[in-house]
Amino acid sequence: MSKGTSSDTSLGRVSRAAFPSPTAAEMAEISRIQYEMEYTEGISQRMRVPEKLKVAPPNADLEQGFQEGVPNASVIMQVPERIVVAGNNEDVSFSRPADLDLIQSTPFKPLALKTPPRVLTLSERPLDFLDLERPPTTPQNEEIRAVGRLKRERSMSENAVRQNGQLVRNDSLWHRSDSAPRNKISRFQAPISAPEYTVTPSPQQARVCPPHMLPEDGANLSSARGILSLIQSSTRRAYQQILDVLDENRRPVLRGGSAAATSNPHHDNVRYGISNIDTTIEGTSDDLTVVDAASLRRQIIKLNRRLQLLEEENKERAKREMVMYSITVAFWLLNSWLWFRR
């Protein structure tokens, strides 16, 4: 018996020495890991909110207090179904805010928004700010509007004719008709008859004449009509300058030599007479102003495109000349080097 008891005591000592008891910190770490694993498993597998969250370390008194209904032991997790503003003007500390009542009682007016277009094309219609002041519909306005439509259609047809080279032929006819009378020609007069040629002035020249500037047009810039008249006059002036430059550049090509240095007085007299008659006959209606401004704007856009094409052609020609010059210089340098090597 003594041997058995001594052996048991020796085994207990060896086991205690080989496997020491865990400390309090190790026990706390083990419990924390176990709690985290259970918490993660409950969230990931069962997908539910935990019933409670402990706010104090585990203690027997707290557990007993929780069982007795003490609220300090844990916090019950409850997700509310809805959130309502506390108070209905019954409690002074939790009264209903006045801003909420104001927001709910204020009716919201719907806003009519128009989607802007992706592409703005000036050739289809004039700008919207030109139609701010529309006069009341009267028979006179209808007649003026019809005249404006006729002018627009006529200008479009004349643009097509000018693209086909009619302007060059008319210009040559002006110089070849020496027996024609040298007086002022109006759009509303009969065409000039000559023994060989018959020349009819183009109404397109009457549209490119300088505008008739009234003194009140420049001063009355506070109204929309004054702004429209200023835009029209400045646009016509710029367009006339561009046409003069193009005429000067075109004269050496069409007539060449000495004819390019001198201008045609008959042509200048005709243009001057047409400009004077046009300034006296042209009305002051808003519709005609809008039509003229839109047509002049389209013509200026076309001229700008032509000038851009000419500039691009000049740049390409300069590049080609530079490349050819470089190739020529390199060729002669190579030939000279080979000649010196011999």
From Swiss-Prot:
It is a single-pass type IV membrane protein. The chain crosses the membrane at residues 323-340. One of its GO terms (biological process) is peroxisome fission. Residues 341-342 are mitochondrial intermembrane. Residues 1-322 are cytoplasmic. The modification Phosphoserine is found at residues 155, 157, 172, 202, 229, 233, 295. The modification Phosphothreonine is found at residues 115, 200. It holds the Pfam family Miff. GO terms for molecular function: identical protein binding; protein homodimerization activity. Highly expressed in heart, kidney, liver, brain, muscle, and stomach. Belongs to the Tango11 family. It is linked to Encephalopathy due to defective mitochondrial and peroxisomal fission 2: An autosomal recessive disorder characterized by delayed psychomotor development, severe hypotonia with inability to walk, microcephaly, and abnormal signals in the basal ganglia. More variable features include early-onset seizures, optic atrophy, and peripheral neuropathy. Plays a role in mitochondrial and peroxisomal fission. Promotes the recruitment and association of the fission mediator dynamin-related protein 1 (DNM1L) to the mitochondrial surface. May be involved in regulation of synaptic vesicle membrane dynamics by recruitment of DNM1L to clathrin-containing vesicles. Homodimer. Interacts with DNM1L. Interacts with C11orf65/MFI; the interaction inhibits MFF interaction with DNM1L. This is Mitochondrial fission factor. The lineage of its organism: Eukaryota, Metazoa, Chordata, Craniata, Vertebrata.
